[in-house]
C-alpha cells in the first residue's frame, strides 16, 4: 500500500493523543520500517512516548536512547533526553535519572524553557547531586 508517510505519521500521533496506544505503536513501527528520512527523528521520539504512556519504561528507555544516539541534533533531542530521565525516574533508578537530567542541561543549554524547567524540577525532586 502506497500511503504518504507524512499522513501515516500524523495519523499515528492522532491515535496516540486519543489514547489508542497499541494502534499508534503499530503505525509508528510500520513507519520506522519505511524510513522516511525527514520524519525519522520524530518517529523515534514518538515510539518512546507510546511506551512511556503505556508505562513500559524499560522499552521507553531503549527508544529514547536510540533517538538520542541516532539523532542527537534533531529538534527532538532535548525531549528525548528529558523523557529518558523521566523513564529512569519512574523505575526508581535515581542515579541514571540524575545523570541524564544534568547532562541534558549541559548538552542542550538552548532547549525550550519548558524542558529545562522540568529537568531542574525533576533534579530537585530526586535530590540529585549538583554536578
Q: Can you name each region flagged by the protein language model?
A:
Residues 1-14, 18:
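Acidic, proline-/serine-/threonine-rich low-complexity intrinsically disordered segments
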Residues 33-39, 70-76, 106-117:
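Short solvent-exposed coil/turn linkers within tandem alpha-helical repeat scaffolds
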